[in-house]
Amino acid sequence: MNLAWNKILEEVSKKISPQYYERFIDTLKLETLNSEKCTIIAPSATIKTHVERKYQSIIENAILEACGDKIPVEILIETKATSPLQSFLEKSFDQKDFQFNPDYTFETFIVGDCNRLAYTAAKECVRKPAEINPLYLFGSVGVGKTHLLHAIGSELIKKDPWKTVCYIDISSFMNEFRFALQSRELIESFKIKYQSYNCLLVDDIQLLSTNAEKTQDEFFALFNFLFERKRQIVIASDRPSSELTIHERLKSRFVTGVQADIQYPNKEIRKGIVTSHSKIMDLGLSEDVLEFLADQIEEDTRLLLGALNDIYLYKKSYSLLFLNLDKVKEIVKNRLYRKKNVEFSHDRIIESVAKEFNLDAAEIMGKSRKKELIIPRHICFYLLHNVFNVNKSQVGRLFQTQHTTVIHGLRKTEELLSDNKEIRFLVERISSKYKLQ
């Protein structure tokens, strides 16, 4: 039996690179080999799954070459006591445990100017994997980044069920890696798992920080491994890659593909989202209710979907067929952004800031990137959003700039307020002058 097995291994070695032969095939043990079946033992579920996906047909052909018979191959896992840590990792490596959200499809994604580039690029990742690589999606919470990641994963598997697709948020990746660092065997299993995927979908990459040195090194190595083999990589973040607090060498990898900014949806898109999901949920909402929801919830689309869930549960609880606008307002009142009855002029706020810095308001509102205009412009962002409750999208439209630029300006102003007493007093003066109590 050993002689036959050696011949089989010799045939397999001709078809697989030495690196992968040593990593996978060398770890297998022959249990039985007869005219009816060949039983092989793998040391772990990770190795078993990978060999079944990639090399089982090669082994079966090698048996035919060596023995002259077509014999089915069965791969079993070696029975041995495993630590809780090993069991955890083995379970986490099973792709069957993860299911893409069936509601997050390309068909249910409402397309508009705010997200058209991201949608088109995501579709292209399915049509021609690795043609756009990586695809980097960025935008604030609730604009549809996770929706597109799930849509890509679902479509790739639908197109080719043999594709191995991984969706993971970066926090989970970091936790798995920390566990795996406890032994050489586990870190090897970790590498095998992630290197085996045809597509990697990573959410919330902004949570990867410069403090996680080893995790960054591992992710960098994984990125290069998949990229060089033309495997699709899609990354989602709440900010442009230039604003990530990670090593420059990793940032440089993210800009090699397409960076797609997803803006907050306008009212037309929000109404499309509400209409589409209310039909799926069979809510039977009237036109005035749809208009109300689209008008009141302006930013995070998850709030829109949450409001629809509230309506659904209310209807189901009371066995109602129809809800009028007044009842809907009562049901979703805690989810709405409260619009303050404070009237003020945007121009007056901007003019006040300009006066403090001996500038013209038109300069602050303009496109110039002169250094002396940056801080006043950011202070305007801060006053309008944090003090007078103008949402970020409206601030962006007012200054004709991107949503991410507004977010960056708000962040910089908050840092400035904590360090600079003069700026803090300036903001307080303008706030007290215009804000009604």
From Swiss-Prot:
Record's keyword annotation contains DNA-binding: yes
SUPFAM superfamilies referenced in this protein's UniProt entry, alphabetically: P-loop containing nucleoside triphosphate hydrolases, TrpR-like
Highest taxon, organism lineage: Bacteria
Region (Domain II): 74-98
Keywords attached to this entry: ATP-binding, Cytoplasm, DNA replication, DNA-binding, Lipid-binding, Nucleotide-binding
Pfam families for the chain: Bac_DnaA, Bac_DnaA_C, DnaA_N
Gene3D superfamilies: 1.10.1750.10, 1.10.8.60, 3.30.300.180, P-loop containing nucleotide triphosphate hydrolases
GO molecular function ontology, one term from the record: DNA replication origin binding
Compartments, as annotated in UniProt: Cytoplasm
Region (Domain IV, binds dsDNA): 316-437
Renumbered residue ranges of the record's region Domain I, interacts with DnaA modulators: 1-74
GO cellular component terms attached to this protein's record: cytoplasm; plasma membrane
Chain residues that bind ATP: 142, 144-146
SMART domains the UniProt entry points to: AAA, Bac_DnaA_C
Record-linked HAMAP family: DnaA_bact
Family as reported in the entry's similarity comment: Belongs to the DnaA family.
Domain notes from UniProt: Domain I is involved in oligomerization and binding regulators, domain II is flexibile and of varying length in different bacteria, domain III forms the AAA+ region, while domain IV binds dsDNA.
UniProt subunit comment: Oligomerizes as a right-handed, spiral filament on DNA at oriC.
The protein, known as: Chromosomal replication initiator protein DnaA
